[in-house]
Amino acid sequence: MKKISRKSFLKLASAAAMSGITAGALAACNAASGSTAASSAAAKYTPGTYTATAKGMGDITMTATFSETAITDIQLDLSNETDSIGQAAKDDLIQQLMDAQNSTIDGVSGATVTSDAVKQCMNDCITQAMGGTAVSAPEASAEQASSWRTAPEAIPDSEITKTYDVDVAIIGMGYAGLSCYRELAEEGKNVLVLEAMPRESWWTVGHDIGHINSDYLLSHGVPKVDEVEFLNNWMMQAHGKANPALVMKFAKNSGSTVDWWLDKINPDTLAKTRIHFWPDNEYTVHQLNNGMHYYTGTLEWWENSWENPASGEKNNNTAGQLELKDLSWDNYNYVEENFSDNATALFGTKGVQLVMDGAKVTGVIAQDSDGNYLKINAKNGVVLAGGGFGGNKEMMDDLLPNIKRLFTKDEDFFAPFGRDGSTIQMGVWAGGRLEGDISTMNFDSMTMPDYLPGPLWVDENGQRFQNEAFAGPEINGFFMARAKRGNITSIYDSTYNTQILRGFPGHQAFNYSDPDVVDAMLAKFEAAKAVSPNATEDGFYCADTLDELADALGFDADQKAAFLATVEEYNTVCHSGVDTDFGKDPRFLNAVEQGPFYAHLTTPSLGFALVTTGGFVTTNDQQVLNEDYQPIEGLYASGNTCGMRFGPEYITPIPGASIGMCLTLGRELGKYLAAK
């Protein structure tokens, strides 16, 4: 028996369906025309010219001419499509349609969006020619309508004021771009990096480098991590949506990369680094009862080396006021001082367009601070490393619809450190495929401030609603983001001083290993006791009885009754050692029964994030794929422009995983390109 492919089967089925439509249309005509049926029985179409429109990357218009039995001519207006992709596919698409005489064509590889729109136009024209009504072009989806997806006119060579010929061009000098730049420079490659920020104000955002198995960590007593265990744990937390090859590349190389990065750091600066969530204390938990594992492996740079814009004064050495920019400057200066013959950095110069030769990327056009256009021809490839799109509201509305649907009328996107998305735009214009679920750093997750898994959490109705210690802050906030708004309150009894010491490493988690942080938290409880029954400015309450605590929190009679019943039920669960309600790890089951009692009231909201952390689908070597999942020659993505590293949401089995991945995969990409 002859075998047919699934594609061939679908073509046959489609043709059969079209025949059925034809028969139905003719039957309708016969019923209407009566005695004229015999003379028109052989006709498939009403001769004439028909027009249809559809949405590709922009508006597409088709004009098709029909005889009684065939499509005789097709005209396509693809002027709103990408020059080198959709527009370039025009002749091929027309030929395929003419050969097939219907819309069941393969389309053009790399121009899937345009091909699908052309097929829709063909269907509509055929429907009209058969006496039916054209299907109205649907309202443009957010993806189709967003103006950023439409590529600008190509900048002509006549406007280029200077040309560079290099091996590799890198767009963006954050952690990934700088790491890739340094590696290529050390390998002797002719490399040029574009950085939009001026030299005098350039900095790299963030203060944690998450990694495993560096000599730095091991020398401080941090245990070695099994790479296979690490990969499987990561993939579980990423819902299986990360690229396991990229994650394993990170696991195997992050330690050596951090040691390499620190090798060029000023010793005085290096002495001011520390390890987050280290050392462990007697209460530290690393693996939860559900199997999720959390690791120590975060290097922090704690130095009040930058000024607070509001006060003009140096910041204190407190969490959230730390920057790694001195570490980045030391690495950049090392390259500038030692590899000026083959490595060039252009500050205040922004990449604006990729240079294409058909579907191949051959370089990039940039614009300097004076408005001049520069052309960089890159023999071995262009690296997109300009970060995410958290600073571009239109792109967030377009690319994060699942998150936007979670918002209340009072919530919206806010990412103060977000980039403008320009490198992602350039990649899309070149035909790059973005991952389906683009991850962000907490846009779709609500977390408790100073995330503490030990206390009982109740909602504004006084009821417990989830496992308080299910996972790290990002994953643990999924349910609240999708099901709750309003006040969330943490409930403690007088054993709070040991409860706050039991935790596990996590982004935004309470740092139980830092004595200053612990003392500051203990002071908040003492302050609540001093002003009882009133609240402190931080939202802490204290009362001698649970009844009085409920009153202080403002619960009405029904809420108060629910709250007291909730505490009673929770205490029963704690004493049994098994949380039959929500499955909480028994090590975090702390009964609420020894007065005085405390509460910390917060009102979580959705929409704030530091950055977006998702982008293009790539090969295992970070080469960008097109819409048909085929590599685009000459185009690569790293850092927060590269997708499929975290799954649907940023996760942190080690805090600082974003920067750690940027450094590691940026360097690995540099190695790969150097070997080309």
Report residues per predicted region:
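Active-site- and interface-proximal helix/loop "cap" or "latch" segments in soluble metabolic
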Residues: 41-139
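Extreme N-terminal leader/targeting segments of oxidoreductases
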Residues: 38, 42, 131-167
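Glycine-rich FAD pyrophosphate-binding loop
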Residues: 186-205
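A glycine-rich dinucleotide-binding beta-alpha-beta segment and adjacent secondary-structure elements
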Residues: 353, 561-649
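N-terminal secretory signal peptides and thylakoid transit peptides that target proteins
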Residues: 1-20, 24
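Conserved redox-cofactor binding core of oxidoreductases
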Residues: 251-369, 393-394, 567, 574-600
